[in-house]
Amino acid sequence: MKKVFKKATATVTAAAMLASLTACGGGAASSATTAAPAADTKAEGGAETTEAAASGIDNKDIKIGVSIWSSTDVLGSQCKLILDEAAKALGVQVQYVDQGHVSEKVTASVEQLAAAGCQGIIICNSSDTEMTSAIKTCNDNKVYLAQFFRVISEKNSADIYQAAKDSDYYIGAVHEDEPENGEELVNILLEKGDRNIGLIGWEQGDATWLGRWEGYKAGVEKWNKENPNDKATLSEPQYAGTTSEGGSKAAEALMAADPDLDALIPAGGGGDPLQGAIAAVERAGKTSDIDIVSTDFLPDLGERLENGSMAGESGGHYCDPLISFMMVYNAIKGNYKDFGGKFEDVPFPYLYVSSPDDYKAYEKYFVDQLPYTDEELVDMSKLSMDDLKAAAAKVSIEDAASRAGN
């Protein structure tokens, strides 16, 4: 039984789009800068631009740093694509540091970007504790800071949350509802009839992973309470890190531990662990026996929904860092101010697909083309904070279709 979901967000997942990316160096602590394009030059995606960029504003002295786990894996490269497009449209520089979600590299990345002259930084950290150092570095250097794909827990990290709120330079966080995401995904499996579910995490203690895990468990618990004669089980997690090899080994371990395994949830980690898990299931000849759901759209998701190697996926959220980028940009420009005593919390929706037809609608507006034109990106940069939050909340296939005139 297929579910129809109304939640949506924007992401680019086409292999053709990914091919246009220029890698930002290899390894977990690499760095690269994309400058505002000069007159009659080519931007990173190959489009011709003018010195003033699409906005007509000369922002060439603005540099925004991006601290990200990877700018070259499936999800990270999608994020880089939209951020590079926004930088091109606004005529600003953007510099990336890949930190691999290794705590010491996460904190060092903020120091590196501040030292490089960035006036603002957006960060996808691994754990809340890293934000203590990140906030201090930004306070000391008078650099604006916003999170993407992450939010400091007011409940579990009260002191860090308060430090963020007290800061004159910490703006806020753009993030998804991960417990809800986890519950939606496990429900796809339960409604398909799967009852023995294996779980693959990426990094122990990662706040996003813990939120998704909470949702998986809640979904199974609710199912078992409502269906006492048809109970499901959820394994303890195997950890894969953020590599394809890790995902493959984790899937192999789960299949070996439970011969009756009929579903896998590679929880995330940028897309590479999922690819490894799929490959392991295919090698074992169990593609038709084990349903797989995950988060972070793959470039070939449509094909995988067709051939059964994927049962469903949540994703389409690569525009999350775009919102953080716009927050920092406006802070640098002086349009957003007076951050001390405030914490700007910006929820961002997921898109769920569990059939080829679901994916076709998504593909039309987010794979075959970018979800925003340069003109629309410039218009977004002029929104108030409240209007930017509203724009984030309504990102959807329907919204993109409407803006495209369909």
Give the ranges of each region predicted by the language model.
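A residue-level marker of the well-folded mature domains of exported/periplasmic proteins
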Residues: K2-K7, M17, C24-N406
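Repetitive helical segments and hydrophobic/amphipathic motifs
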Residues: V12-A16
